[in-house]
Structure formats: structure tokens, C-alpha cells
Amino acid sequence: MNKIKQIIIVEGKTDTDKLKSIYGNDLKTIQTKGLSLNKKTLEMIEEFNNKMGVIIFTDPDGAGKKIRQTIIDYLDNKVLNAFIKKDDINKTSKKIGIAEASDDAIKKALDNLIIYDKNNVSLSWTDYINNDFYLKSNRIVICKYFNFDNNISSKTLFKWLNWMNVSIDDIKKIIGE
């Protein structure tokens, strides 16, 4: 099994426990303690990102999206992201989180990291609208391709596509044009 060199940012202890059950006790995580993410934790994440890199791996719910966005907005440079879909969560669980996902879904997410760079601008809003990428049917296809949650807003998808440096031609290939 591949050893993960970066620090993984998760929401809580159960997420850390789940990841360590898969990757071993040498795996390093930082827990945001849910939405109580504070400046000190953000500074620590920034320091680790500059030294060894971090992977943001938050739950596929509203709080997880907000935590991910807060961290990305705080960091100045590239950051790795892992995504898990709600469909990958144990159906009998009342919670929607990393701790409730299957081992295979977690491995797949961490094997398919996506790099975000806030400084990328590969797509204009006009191009995004004129090519109908904002339409729900196209957003679903794009989100599925990148393993994003299907319920992200059009503006968030636009921003994330730019941060990943995805071109118009790339998106057209994804949606089958």
C-alpha cells in the first residue's frame, strides 16, 4: 500500500481513526473539530502545507464543503483535495462522513487527488455560461467525473474548475460534446 506523505485534514477523531485503520498509525492528520476551525488551526495547516503538503478530506455535507472552502481561501498556494460522494457512505449510518465511508471509497478518493491553485484562471464566467456548463445536467456529469458531490452550486463548480486549471475543451470532453 502506498504511504501517504502529506498531512490529511479531516473533521474529527472518528475520521482519523478510520483512516488509520486503513493506512496504519503512521498516518498524520489534523482535525478541524468540525466547523470550529480557528485561526490557530488554519496557521498550522498553512505551515504543514508549505513544508510537506496537506490533503483536504472533509465530509461530503454542507459543513465539510464550508470547511474545505475556508481552508482553500486561507492558503496561498496549491493544495491537494480528496473527495468522497454521499453514495459511498454506509446506507445504514445516520451520519454522512469519512468515518462512515467504505475502505474502498476512501482508497479511491486518496488515489485520485485533485490539485487546487487559486491563481489559475482557465475559464471565464462568460465561457462557462455560453457553453451551458452551468446546466444541472452538465454539472452532474462534471461532478461525477471529478467525484464531487452533485449538489454543489454552479458558482462553486466554476471556481473549482478554474482552480484545477480545467479548460473549455477538457470540460466538453467530459460532458461528451
Swiss-Prot record:
SUPFAM superfamilies: Toprim domain (SSF110455). It is found in: Cytoplasm. It comes from Mycoplasma mycoides subsp. mycoides SC (strain CCUG 32753 / NCTC 10114 / PG1). Its cofactor is Mg(2+). The gene is rnmV. Mg(2+) 1 binds at E11, D59. GO terms for biological process: rRNA processing. Mg(2+) 2 binds at D59, D61. It catalyses: Endonucleolytic cleavage of RNA, removing 21 and 42 nucleotides, respectively, from the 5'- and 3'-termini of a 5S-rRNA precursor. One of its GO terms (cellular component) is cytoplasm. Belongs to the ribonuclease M5 family. This is Ribonuclease M5. Its EC number is 3.1.26.8. The keyword Transferase does not apply. Residues 5-99 form the Toprim domain. Its main location: cytoplasm. Required for correct processing of both the 5' and 3' ends of 5S rRNA precursor. Cleaves both sides of a double-stranded region yielding mature 5S rRNA in one step. CDD domains: TOPRIM_RNase_M5_like (cd01027). The keyword rRNA processing applies. One of its GO terms (molecular function) is ribonuclease M5 activity. InterPro entries: RNase_M5 (IPR004466), RNase_M5_C (IPR025156), TOPRIM_dom (IPR006171), TOPRIM_RNase_M5-like (IPR034141). Binds two Mg(2+) per subunit. The lineage of its organism: Bacteria, Bacillati, Mycoplasmatota, Mollicutes, Mycoplasmataceae. Keywords: Cytoplasm, Endonuclease, Hydrolase, Magnesium, Metal-binding, Nuclease, Ribosome biogenesis, RNA-binding, rRNA processing, rRNA-binding.
